[in-house]
Curated annotation (Swiss-Prot):
It is found in: Cytoplasm. Its main location: cytoplasm. This is Ribosomal RNA small subunit methyltransferase H. S-adenosyl-L-methionine binds at residues 47-49, 66, 93, 108, 115. It catalyses: cytidine(1402) in 16S rRNA + S-adenosyl-L-methionine = N(4)-methylcytidine(1402) in 16S rRNA + S-adenosyl-L-homocysteine + H(+). One of its GO terms (biological process) is rRNA base methylation. InterPro entries: RsmH, SAM-dep_MeTrfase_MraW_recog, SAM-dependent_MTases_sf. It comes from the Bacteria. PANTHER family: 12S RRNA N4-METHYLCYTIDINE METHYLTRANSFERASE, S-ADENOSYL-METHYLTRANSFERASE MRAW. Residues 290-305 have a biased composition (Basic residues). It comes from Synechococcus sp. (strain WH7803).
Length: 305
């Protein structure tokens, strides 16, 4: 494994989480099952995980999927040393089927650092930008701003509670709808985050986690149908694998992890490799705070499936 990843576009720098954890776990698996053949990186992003796999395992070929054009451009740069072994496809993994059986399917479900750190994408409550949150900014899908205007207060509260696990969801939804009625659409993510934070008691606004975190998560999940898309992946991906092939999924919050855990337990095509999720080391958590909530689960396709 190289000490440094290949250089990539300066607008899309992303440190892949659980990289060493993933590679170490894969190294423990019989090489006959997966260290040659096709890898499908269902969430290519900037190509961080893919570059490590391609460098470490020279017999792998890779198909990378991503609906974000900025991510695809960055990945093409980062993966250029292995371009003869790489194909990048502009698609959401829910709409995809590989041309042949894969030996490994990988999905990193987190929002990448560049998406969070570019104000214009509208994912961040720390940087002011349009209240957008679409993974594919070129799509004609509904933005977060449009969603909160369209929804009734009670439905918005239910959404924030269900997808953000936010205990103050009704108070937050009431404030959002009151603001929209009084002043029209929010100017951007900063004013929206300020309004959400104002629903918290003063002491609760000074914690390590920003008070708007759960509400932003809920809206992002809804705008991109993230849980529906994940359910589709969990249903489809075992069918993409050859017998003995591996399915590795990195999740970042309990709604995702519960779905992955349940699917790995209940899908008769799969055997769990990780009984408990693998997590970042203390060193990685210190180096990359976004790894603190990451959980990796791996399953193997049964030979008789």
């Amino acid at each position: 494994m190289p000490d440094q990843l290949p250089a990539t576009d300066s607008t899309f720098r992303h440190v892949p989480v659980l990289a060493d954890v993933l590679l170490n776990a894969l190294d423990e698996e019989p090489s006959v099952h997966w260290q040659s053949g096709l890898v499908v990186d269902a969430t290519l992003g900037g190509g961080g995980h893919s570059s490590l796999l391609l460098d470490r395992y020279p017999d792998l070929r890779l198909i990378g999927l991503d609906q974000d054009p900025t991510a695809r451009a960055a990945a093409a740069t980062r993966l250029s040393p292995w371009k003869e072994r790489v194909s990048i496809v502009a698609t959401n993994f829910a709409d995809y089927s590989p041309p042949q059986s894969a030996s490994l399917v990988l999905a990193d479900l987190g929002v990448s650092s560049p998406q969070l750190d570019v104000a214009a994408r509208g994912f961040s409550f720390r940087l002011d930008g349009p209240l957008d949150m679409r993974m594919n900014p070129e799509s004609d899908g509904e933005t977060a701003g449009e969603l909160i205007e369209r929804m009734e207060e009670s439905d918005l509260a239910d959404l924030i509670y269900a997808y953000g696990e936010e205990r103050l969801s009704r108070r937050i939804a009431r404030r959002i709808k009151a603001d929209l009625a009084a002043q029209g659409p929010y100017a951007g993510t900063a004013s929206f985050a300020y309004a959400v934070a104002g629903c918290y008691p003063p002491k609760a606004r000074r914690g390590r986690i920003h008070p708007a975190t759960r509400t932003f998560q809920a809206l992002r999940i809804a705008v991109n149908d993230e849980l529906g898309v994940l359910d589709q992946l969990l249903s489809s991906a075992p069918g993409w694998l050859q017998p003995g092939g591996l399915l590795a999924i990195i999740s970042f919050h309990s709604l995702e992890d519960r779905r992955v855990k349940t699917a790995f337990l209940q899908d008769e095509r799969l055997d769990r490799i990780t009984r408990r999720p693998l997590v970042a080391s203390a060193e990685e958590q210190e180096r990359n705070p976004r790894s603190r909530s990451a959980k990796l689960r791996i399953a193997r396709k049964r030979s008789e499936s």
